[in-house]
């Protein structure tokens, strides 16, 4: 006869208790692991934002340089337009110059940055940064295309002599292309600098790498004396 009829149920409750303790330990370990993973990912999001703000500060220098260059471009293109309105035989130009073309890194938005920022800073903030980097890409592409206009205009430096009607027309097309590019790039620069400043990006402290007053495009245009 069993003197302790409750022994088996107590043993069963003990096993259940041990199981619950083990499960609780597993859940706590998983929660800690997930918490650590989330913390590490949040740190990566912070580091990504810091890197992106550094790239945007560098890009602000490019935008400010465009603002400084724009008046010189307007003046030079008008001088070239007037030059092509002259006689059939045109003197060569000593130095036409061109707009500066600077590079800035845009790698911060590549890879997993969009998804990372969306998770830890919200979809709206990720969208804002995406729009900024898209604007940076478009600005760089347009600036590169503008260089082709100026390269063809610099052929007026090569030699004096007759410039036939077809060539004059082509050069006037290049002037129009360079003028439109400058208008667009300057407008983009103005808008993006305002937007970057609204995002607490330091857009003013870094000095410009080029003194435009010393560049040929900002100097009075002179003709080669024969």
Regions found by a protein language model. Name each.
Residues 9-27:
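N-terminal signal-anchor/signal peptide hydrophobic helix marking the start
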Residues 1-13, 34-226:
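Long, hydrophobic alpha-helical segments that serve as membrane-spanning/inserting helices
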